[in-house]
């Protein structure tokens, strides 16, 4: 049996976009820093990294669709932080952002990763943005790097 999997490497020519929500920017700024760090550590060229900022997580699928339709990116890393409040708003935003990103990924058949935190508390979000639980932005970018390499090999 032949095993096909992506490697954690870039050759410097890959063009990548990070699409991040500004809402909860105290968290998303850290996620972006982690994603950028992963991109550069694994051979990415900073000139080939674009940061697209949208108002909130609900707008991520729109920007993702626009970025992928332009056909200039090898992959896109989506980042956001949705923190539960006292109303059902969290459930709607989390569900629609997730569904929109998944549907857009399948529509364009390009590597996309989901680095959108969905947490019950701000403390949980902080833990996942570079504190106790690592940086999920870094993890989302390393996943994207592997997918880009896998995409080239399939």
Curated annotation (Swiss-Prot):
One MF annotation (Gene Ontology) recorded for this entry: 6,7-dimethyl-8-ribityllumazine synthase activity
Name the catalytic site residues: 89 (proton donor)
* Keyword Transferase part of the UniProt annotation: yes
Under InterPro entries, the record lists: LS, LS/RS, LS/RS_sf
Xref: Pfam families: DMRL_synthase
Name the pathway. Answer: Cofactor biosynthesis; riboflavin biosynthesis; riboflavin from 2-hydroxy-3-oxobutyl phosphate and 5-amino-6-(D-ribitylamino)uracil: step 1/2
Q: What class of enzyme is it?
A: transferase
| UniProt GO cellular component terms | cytosol; riboflavin synthase complex
- Coiled-coil stretches are none
Q: Where does 5-amino-6-(D-ribitylamino)uracil bind?
A: 23, 57-59, 81-83, 114
Q: Does the keyword Cytoplasm feature in the UniProt annotation?
A: no
The name this protein carries in UniProt is 6,7-dimethyl-8-ribityllumazine synthase
Specify the species. Answer: Nitratiruptor sp. (strain SB155-2)
The top of its lineage is: Bacteria, Pseudomonadati, Campylobacterota, Epsilonproteobacteria, Nautiliales
